[in-house]
Amino acid sequence: VPLPAHLPKRLEHMTPYIYSKPELQRLFRSAMEYQKNRSKIHPECMKMILQLTYFLGLRLHETMSLRIRDLNQPDLYVHIRESKFYKSRIVTYNHKVGELIDTFLKWREKQGMCCVPESKLFLDKKGLDMHIDTVRGAFERIREHAGISRSDKSPFQPRLHDLRHTFAVHRLTSWYRENQDVQQLLPVLSTYLGHTHLSHTSVYLTMTDGLLGEANNRFESYIKQGKDE
């Protein structure tokens, strides 16, 4: 499936920020360190929210809407129910992510949090549902504590939602590195992300230096093979 010939223009303020791997690690550490005793949110919950949003490429409201019943640990997937465009989907994950979820669930049980199937996965220190704006506010403080900011001219700082964009770009970069046919795999990524049209995936997958580097390496390899033949 070829990429769309003409992609919609993205406004400057909507340009995603793609976190580097070291920045992701700093974010996860900062979630456990910053305002540990003052925040309404358990640091363990905040860290897991960031990790699931990135590792599974979820929208923030999808992460926040997860319930215990949506986790299928034996088969390594989560059920995203009636998300954007009122569509449900299955999002798979690997054993490493499964271990993170297992550890979190055990911690959650030790805290005495409600564990019935209908219970929200993420609860605040009072055992109540967490408000998405509270999470966004906490993320801003975590990001600042981690020392992460934009170096371009954009007036908008990196967002929590950019973790989803980062997942997609890192996935593409891995496919290029593995010499995979990205055009053939893009529909798979589009379905995984819950997009209704392939063009939606193409638009928001910002090309990073790393991704362009992988594409250039592949092109140079192709040219070299042609000369050898």
Predicted regions mapped to residue ranges:
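Conserved catalytic core of the tyrosine transesterase superfamily
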Residues: 1-229
